[in-house]
Amino acid sequence: MTSESEPLDWRASLSSADRYDNIQAIKAALEHSDLPASATHQDAFSIENEAYKTSSSRDQYDAACRIKPGREPPLPTELAQPAAAPDEAPESPGIIIGSYQSCHYVASGVTAEVYRSKVTALKVIVETRNIEPHDPFREAKILKLLEKPCIPLLDTFRDQEQRFTLAFPFMPLSLEALVKQGPIPIDRIRRHFRDLFTALSYIHERGIIHRDIKPSALLLESIDGPAYLSDFGTAWHPELSVSTEPADQKILDIGTGPYRAPEALFGDKAYGTAVDMWGAGTMLAECCRKSPQPLFESRAAHEDGNQLGLILSIFKSIGSPTKESWPEAAKFKTPPFEMYQVFEGRSWEDLLPDVGVEFRELIAALVKYNSSNRATAPEALQFKCMTETNN
């Protein structure tokens, strides 16, 4: 039984090693179930993360992580019951973080945990080791230089445990949440992507590369917007980053899953802002589908072969690159030519048959191998699908 002295935020006493051990234990148990072997690792991560998010005590968390061999994995909370309304008041009193009262856990990432205190979101840095390209201090410096539609930084401080914390306006939704709900109306897609391209225009004009464009990085004030570009934890800045990452020696471990640009996959350390435009193009394709799903297939980052799987999915979808379609790749450390089976690829009409021609034109202009040929953010805003009021 949980002791009376256990802190309200029981997660503070849980180490990364504890979580890893639980994931491995869950994985071992699932290997004895009827699940295919390829699914057990991802399900283990999902089960542990669900327990971490929803448990009210360490005992409850530990119990949720104890999966008996042969037992079917529990249904994730978001599928088992309706999600609470974004403005619904939590039942527990929450915890105190700095001067913020009634803080409630929302989510966690590689280096941070996010809490909500009324209208404020608090990003608490819990991983203090240097995990490049993650740098919360650089993130804060970059955010202070930006304006809407980039997410506004309200404050930074050290909490009671001396953990660095960033404060933002709380946004109840993200583009990722809309994608999970099903088809998105065209006018809504247009509105949110106008905000995204406007934000990218703003940061790219200043030489900043976001490096992790994905649906969860676009936060929404409401289902109809406005949208704000967030998650600058791995962003590259021409002045703030250059001491550890020279412009021609940037880190390659950037991006998330199916939104990663091919130049980073093939070792081009001199990549530029076009990596963001590739990510935006793949996001747009996903959102425009009647049944939203990623344009390319990619295994979870922790799974073996995730990068190769993404490369093959790209090649099979839009065709293997050639020296004519991707001339800049000839100078890469690992050129993609003559290394893989040659795939002809498919037309955009075949890849996205249920997407309007105007949106397909923009997607095709963004999802190109040669980065110098991709549409820029200001150019994207001038495409017909972005300027129309109806489609």
Predicted segments, located by residue:
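Protein kinase glycine-rich loop
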Residues: 103-109, 114
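Conserved short submotifs of the Hanks-type protein kinase catalytic core
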Residues: 161-174
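Short beta-strand micro-motifs within the conserved protein kinase catalytic domain, predominantly
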Residues: 152-164
